[in-house]
Regions:
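Active-site loop-to-helix "anion-binding N-cap" substructures in soluble metabolic enzymes
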Residues: 1-230, 234-249, 256, 261-271, ...
């Protein structure tokens, strides 16, 4: 198949489906025909989560990518997640519906900058959050997710000199609960950085009995207000297992779909966008990159087999090692 120049320029296929096409049904048909599975992160829109074979957080998606028998994986999330799938299953085709689906955290740590930082700190091990490019992972000793970071760090020698990046907030939290003094990269998620103490405090006045759940990518003062601190999977588990009927949720709004699906008798209140200096609200509780995934793009990527993720062999050889070490330790 010859790729159109406009597809390559755009980074995705924008061909319209034939009139009357049931996108979900056609996606499921093509998955069966091509031995493909749809993997979706909790932050994608509800229609995609409902159409997916597997929905999870970064850790669960990595595990699924490593164990699946499918020959084709469509990773509905962001680009580093598709790279992780390819690293763990190099012989399989990994499709990414939109190559523009990046990550502000991954963008905050370039491989050349990390390499220089390592050279300035000889003898240090590098712990990289999974929200990084394959090139950064290739410079890393072990990868972590928000769901297993503490568990992994706890297993490293107490006298180990550690660099943690790129999420400053997650690293700061891990330092606080482990007593470590890791050197922290100054990166952050554009969504979680914008949650504020004042907006959560306002919600607590409206819902005094609600449990506050906050993602570990949030700033320290926000985490200090939270009753539950953890990954998206941690939040889901807590909501399912506890009797509280109301939850204030400080993470990307896509998780509300799965929370409501699994706990239909409970109320989940998203922390609203903060008000800017201009008085305007921003949609900062949504990740613009996750929302680049659409049913039409999934339909097209399955139909045409593009965009497919490819990673330089030399980078892939080094990048897969810290991911495999993470899976062993967690």
């Amino acid at each position: 198949m010859k790729l159109k120049k406009e597809w390559i320029k755009q980074g995705f296929i924008n061909e319209p489906a034939p009139e009357g096409t049931d996108l979900k049904a056609e996606i499921r048909r093509m998955c069966k025909e091509k031995n493909a599975i749809i993997l979706a992160h909790y932050y994608t829109v509800g229609d995609i989560q409902d159409c997916a074979d597997f929905v999870g957080d970064s850790l669960a998606l990595a595990r699924k990518a490593a164990e699946t028998d499918a020959q084709v994986m469509v990773m509905c999330g962001v680009h580093f997640m598709a790279e992780t799938c390819k690293l763990l299953s190099p012989g399989k085709t990994v499709l990414c519906p939109d190559l523009n689906a990046g990550c502000s955290l991954a963008d905050s740590c370039k491989a050349e900058d990390l390499k220089k930082f390592k050279e300035e700190h000889p003898g240090y091990q590098v712990i990289s959050y999974v929200n990084t490019t394959a090139a950064v992972k290739a410079l890393t000793d072990v990868v972590v997710t928000s769901g297993n970071a503490k568990k992994v760090v706890d297993q490293l020698p107490l006298d180990a000199k550690l660099i943690f990046g790129p999420d400053y907030n997650l690293g700061n939290y891990i330092n606080s609960v482990t007593g470590r003094k890791m050197l922290l990269w100054n990166g952050g998620c554009h969504v979680h950085e914008r949650f504020s103490v004042s907006r959560i405090a306002e919600l607590k006045k409206q819902y005094p009995h609600a449990v506050v759940m906050a993602h570990l990518e949030c700033k320290g003062p926000v985490l200090a207000l939270a009753d539950v601190k953890g990954s998206t999977a941690n939040m889901l588990q807590y909501a399912k297992e506890h009797d509280a009927k109301q939850f204030i949720v400080a993470t990307e709004a896509g998780i509300l779909h799965e929370l409501q699906r699994t706990c239909p008798d409970k109320e989940f209140i998203p922390v609203p966008p903060e008000i800017s200096e201009s008085g305007m609200e921003c949609s900062c509780n949504e990740c613009q990159y996750m929302k680049m995934n659409t049913l039409l793009k999934i339909y097209n990527t399955l139909k045409y087999g593009w965009p497919a993720v490819e990673i330089d062999e030399a980078i892939a050889k080094d990048a897969v090692k810290p991911i495999e070490r993470m899976l062993e330790l967690s």
